Design a protein with these regions (language model features):
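His-Asp phosphorelay/catalytic-motif detector in bacterial-type signaling
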Residues: 2, 46-48, 72-78
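Two-component/phosphorelay signaling modules centered on CheY-like receiver
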Residues: 3, 11-30
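Acidic, metal-coordinating helix/loop segments flanking the phosphotransfer/catalytic sites
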Residues: 6, 31-49, 57
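The short loop immediately C-terminal to the conserved phospho-acceptor aspartate in CheY-like receiver
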Residues: 11, 55-57, 78
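Short amphipathic alpha-helix used as the core "switch/output" element in two-component signaling
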Residues: 40, 62-76, 93
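Short, conserved "switch-loop" micro-motifs in signal-transduction and mechanochemical regulators
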Residues: 73, 85-86, 97
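Receiver (REC) domain alpha4 helix and immediately following alpha4-beta5 loop
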Residues: 88-92
Length: 98
């Protein structure tokens, strides 16, 4: 069975690109444009892996806050946090939350 990967990013182009590449490699993907959509996807089915953008513009919480919420639901879900606008403080915060 293929890994189920949840891609969380506010930019449609990024979601489409990452999802397309992973789908072509045989992975199952779902996407979410906001923290609320991501949490709803978790309620539906826990993924094998989450790819999470740090900056979720227009969302009820940013990526670090969403990471905390994800880890409260299931601390075992692996999460890869990414951003085109990161800095050391953001990286330290992400590592600190799992």
């Amino acid at each position: 069975m293929a890994l189920d990967i949840l891609i969380v990013d506010d930019e449609q182009d990024i979601r489409d690109l990452v999802s397309g590449v992973l789908d072509d490699e045989g992975y199952g993907t779902r996407t979410a444009a906001s923290a609320d959509e991501a949490l709803a996807a978790l309620d539906e089915r826990l993924p094998s892996l989450i790819l999470l953008d740090v900056w979720l513009r227009g969302s009820s919480m940013d990526g670090i806050e969403l990471l905390r919420a994800i880890k409260l639901r299931d601390p075992q879900i692996p999460v890869i946090v990414f951003s085109g606008h990161g800095n050391i403080d953001t990286a330290v915060a992400a590592i600190g939350h799992g």
